[in-house]
C-alpha cells in the first residue's frame, strides 16, 4: 500500500446475487472507469468464495471482515477515513454500478478545495449523505477535522450507515463539500426517474403537478441537505453510462451484463 493511494470502497456480506454479482461487475468496471484507483471490497465470512475469486481476478483488493451484527458491514467501506495512507476514497454500493457520469463528477471535485464530495442524481436521494455516493479527501479532512472512526458494531437496521453519517460526518462537512445534484441544478424535462421504493409515490411522480412537487414540496422536505452557500453543481458532460440512467440506481444483475473494457 503506497502513501497517497486512491480507493473505491464497497461492503459485501451475504449471498444475494444483487450485491455479490454486482460487486463482481463493479470490480470489472473499476478497471475501465477508474484505472488508476484501487477497488477495495470489505467482505464478510458469509460471502461465497466463487464471487470473491472473481472480484480478485479483476484485480480488486479484498479485505475479509467479521460481521458482528445485522448491518454493521455497511460501515466497513468507511474505514479508509481513519487511514493516513489514503489520499482520496469514494464509497459506493455494490447493487449500483460505477459510471462515467460519476467519474467526471469525482474529477471535478478533486480539483476543488473541498474535503468531501456528495452525489444526488434521483429524487429519492434525500439523506444528508448518501452512504454509497460520497467521497473524502483524507489529506484535507485530517488537517481540518482530525481522524474519525465510523465503525458501528451495533448497527441492526438497514439505514444505520446513513444515520451515523448524518450524526457524525455531516456536521463536519456540511459547509465543506462539493455536491453534484441533478435535481437542484436542472430544469425538469420529461418524466423523472423512478424505481420501486422511492419516497415519491408513482402517481405523484408522473402525475399533474410534478414540477411543483419536485421543486417546492420535495425541496422543503429536504432543506437540511441544502445548507446556505453550498457548492452545488450540475453533473459534467460524460460518456454514456453502461448501466442504468442515474448514479446510484439499483441494477438487477439478471437484466444486465458487464460491458467490455474500452480501449
Regions found by a protein language model. Name each.
Residues 124, 137-252:
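Catalytic core and acceptor-binding pocket of nucleotide-sugar-dependent glycosyltransferases
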Residues 77-82:
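Short, conserved alpha-helix that lines the donor NDP-sugar binding/gating region
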Residues 94-96:
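Short acidic donor-binding/metal-coordinating loop in glycosyltransferase active sites
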Residues 256-263:
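Conserved small/polar residues in nucleotide/adenosyl-binding loops
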Residues 1-67:
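N-terminal anchoring/stem segment of glycosyltransferases
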